[in-house]
Amino acid sequence: MPRNENPIEKTESFGHVVKVQQVIDFMVLSDLMGGQRYHSEMEQFITQTFNGVGVNDAYFSNRLKALFEAGHVTRHWDGDNRYNRFYRITDSGMEYFKLMLREMPERVKRAKRVYDSFDSYIEKFGKMNLK
């Protein structure tokens, strides 16, 4: 195959599209701005906000752990029940949230453009005879 003499210039990369972890982090921190929340409350908040689309429980737990390890949230147990863990946002979490609040609107717009283009591309194959 001959080398492309006129390559298309890449103006952006997929790394600049919204990532699932950023959506979860944003939703968790925004919810915690209203006060402490339990793991299950935040999970329900996300599912409700996205009209029934939720987060895999193990992935959600890993994101909460990552936010804790980064110092963006604190976590405590309510009594002896290890499942009654509640979280609070920290000053570092507020700064991270402010950063995301500045960056996310453009990332979401970019993601919409990418997904619209991908949707159009997929439609081409729906019209093909793939026998």
Where on the chain are the PLM-derived regions?
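Basic amphipathic alpha-helical segments that dock to polyanions
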Residues: 60-67
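Basic, amphipathic "hinge/linker" alpha-helix immediately C-terminal to the N-terminal HTH DNA-binding motif
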Residues: 82-101
